[in-house]
């Protein structure tokens, strides 16, 4: 996967349209932070799903996860910063945008989410990576940039890292999830302008052309006041 990213990035750089092709476009604060504002709610939703899964599934998931969370500071930086950037550039910046040139935007989001989930390997990881891919893809589709999903992905992974370093006590875990619940309510309210912008209708979007090739070519403006 990393090799694919390097090859594609090198090609796009040579074409002098790297940021444009990967949708690393500037977005204003309300839209930029929308994904991060939704991250606590997404983490709570995933946690609820994990609670009802068979114990045998969770054993393999926990074994795979332990290798990721035991890398010290470097491991944390890889999970919270490097992985979200690389994965969002690949799955949303490269794959979703190319799919959207051939199929409607909603299908490009769905297909890229399936690929995103499948590349995580473990069935449990697919079970939460797929819906996360749908949310990340939708946000980027409406914003015309992958920066919102990069921050959302970082926030989601960061929440998991905080949980991993908590003391092993019921009180600590309860306090963590209560704080997460409060964040899931408060942050979307604070970012209501950015969230509202995502659902503003784009009258010029058409199947196969939902995402602008140039910022601002559609009447829909996700950071419009």
What residue spans do the PLM features occupy?
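Alpha-helical transmembrane segments in multi-pass membrane proteins
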Residues: 1-15, 30, 34, 176-178
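Structural signal for the C-terminal ends of transmembrane alpha-helices
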Residues: 9-18, 139-141, 186-195
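Membrane-helix interface segments
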Residues: 18, 28-31, 72-73, 103-110, ...
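Juxtamembrane helix-loop-helix connectors linking adjacent transmembrane helices
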Residues: 19-89, 97, 101, 197-207, ...
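Membrane-interface helix/loop boundary segments of multi-pass membrane proteins
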Residues: 86-111, 138-145
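Small-polar-interrupted transmembrane alpha-helices in polytopic inner-membrane proteins
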Residues: 105-120, 154
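Functionally important transmembrane alpha-helices
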Residues: 113, 124-180
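C-terminal membrane module of polytopic membrane proteins
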Residues: 154-225
